[in-house]
Amino acid sequence: MSGPTWLPPKQPEPARAPQGRAIPRGTPGPPPAHGAALQPHPRVNFCPLPSEQCYQAPGGPEDRGPAWVGSHGVLQHTQGLPADRGGLRPGSLDAEIDLLSSTLAELNGGRGHASRRPDRQAYEPPPPPAYRTGSLKPNPASPLPASPYGGPTPASYTTASTPAGPAFPVQVKVAQPVRGCGPPRRGASQASGPLPGPHFPLPGRGEVWGPGYRSQREPGPGAKEEAAGVSGPAGRGRGGEHGPQVPLSQPPEDELDRLTKKLVHDMNHPPSGEYFGQCGGCGEDVVGDGAGVVALDRVFHVGCFVCSTCRAQLRGQHFYAVERRAYCEGCYVATLEKCATCSQPILDRILRAMGKAYHPGCFTCVVCHRGLDGIPFTVDATSQIHCIEDFHRKFAPRCSVCGGAIMPEPGQEETVRIVALDRSFHIGCYKCEECGLLLSSEGECQGCYPLDGHILCKACSAWRIQELSATVTTDC
């Protein structure tokens, strides 16, 4: 890259004059106060920068100085010389491309670059943006309103007569190449704050920018061509993206096959008012009067309602339902339990006792033949069933006095008896054999004093002992 070359100073000034800001207004005016007059100098060609690009106005050799493009694409001149507004012809394609490139580079440029001196600028120009040659339209440069501050201000390039001193700083913005972001709209007014960041349009909803930098929402010559590459609301943008998805209709062959099957099914199964439902045996429809049988809360064909064992038809016959299965009477009886007393099948209630099944009328006492349904009973050693009374009468111990069976008292379940001399006695039969005194097994006075196999009280037992002693003495 090449920088600006300057002529050696001819008239150096010993004094330094303050430099002011050069305001390019585009109108001729007095030369800036630098303490020395401007000297003619040869034409200087500046290297193109991302934010400031120099153009040679086509006005002829009488052009006063190098022109440069400031922020927002307005052609300006340095050294306070008037800007040639008509120098950039609307029909010039190259000038329009450079103007758009500089605007894109400056407004999309990176932020935070430090200000550099104009004599130390060395940058590579960014690649020109993609454009369409067929849709370029001349855009007249809008005049920049004067503002007290804001934006990059061009430096006053001094000639040989300018004293050597600190040059006015020039703010240079370098554009950073950003992929996927569209340039902002032209015509934005210059503000004092920092430039806005790059605009990233949302895919499918953002603005599509064409070579003329027109939005789809703005009516213009290039809007129609750009909108052709964007589908409707349901579609996506360009670049190999998806379009609106249209549901595919069913092939005619499949539709015809489906209609044919439906027609055949309707012909084989015509709707009828005599339809009763599906058969519980075969699962087919029961249609027609007299063709079905209702049983077990279901509908059966006449030929399907048969016995589950012998397969005999049960229409008009008695049948037995066991676990939702139908049985004829013979097959049902064969499956029943037999009574342990009469050996007949039990068709009604079953009375179970000691692991056997009985008819309620067959479960009786073997002595009195009374039914024992709900009555306590007992069995003997041969598994004969007895009621409690008959069992005690038959198997209870006998009293040695009266000879009767010793049985429990009414309302009692236990039998109370007195055993003495290996004999059993009722409580009321346990008396002294001499005087008839009621003996007791607990009292000492009324206790039993047996003598020679007799039950005697204490007094009677003593009298008998004395009597026997006297007899023995007399015999001696």
UniProtKB/Swiss-Prot annotation:
Modified residues (Phosphotyrosine): Y55
Stretch list, region Disordered: 1-93, 108-253
GO BP: any one term: focal adhesion assembly
Compositionally biased residues, Low complexity: 152-167
Location of this chain's protein in the cell: Cytoplasm, Cytoskeleton; Cell junction, Focal adhesion; Nucleus; Cytoplasm
Record's compositionally biased regions (Pro residues): 1-12
Region entry Interaction with MAGI1 and PTPN13, spans: 469-476
RNA-binding in keyword set: no
Protein name: Thyroid receptor-interacting protein 6
Organism: Homo sapiens
Lineage: Eukaryota, Metazoa, Chordata, Craniata, Vertebrata
Originating gene: TRIP6
